[in-house]
A protein has these predicted regions:
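Short, surface-exposed beta-edge/turn micro-motifs
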Residues: 1-4, 17-18, 49
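A short beta-strand micro-motif
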Residues: 3-11
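Short, low-complexity interaction segments enriched in Ser/Thr/Pro/Gly
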Residues: 5, 22, 68-70
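Generic detector of N-terminal low-structure segments
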Residues: 9, 21, 37-38
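Glycine-centered tight beta-turn/hairpin loop motif at sheet-sheet or coil-to-beta transitions
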Residues: 11-14, 79
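A short, exposed loop/beta-hairpin motif centered on an aromatic-Gly-Thr core
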Residues: 15-26, 30
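Short, mixed-charge low-complexity intrinsically disordered segments
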Residues: 38-86
Length: 86
């Protein structure tokens, strides 16, 4: 089974969420690296409370919930979340 991963992004005065579907086996840091296409996450990218710097934004994994294949297809069809392979 896969997980629906919810990202919180702070971009200046704006805050929004984005979603991706990943295997259970990956850490939050590895998922952030993949989702935001960060080549090598460095220690100094760590900010606080599990937020990481990405360009001029703070990003974090705020939720991971199990999701079945039918729901993955629906999310994909509506362009809400896509399945990622690392």
């Amino acid at each position: 089974m896969k997980q629906l991963v919810t990202f919180k992004i702070h971009d200046g005065g704006q805050e929004y969420e984005s979603f991706g579907v990943y295997d259970h086996k990956y850490s939050d840091v590895r998922i952030i690296e993949d989702f935001f296409s960060i080549e090598n996450m460095r220690e100094d990218y760590d900010y606080k409370d599990n937020y990481w710097w990405y360009d001029d934004k703070l990003v974090s994994v705020v939720d991971r919930v199990d999701i079945d294949d039918d729901k993955i297809k629906i999310m994909n069809d509506y362009g809400v979340a896509y399945e990622h392979s690392i």
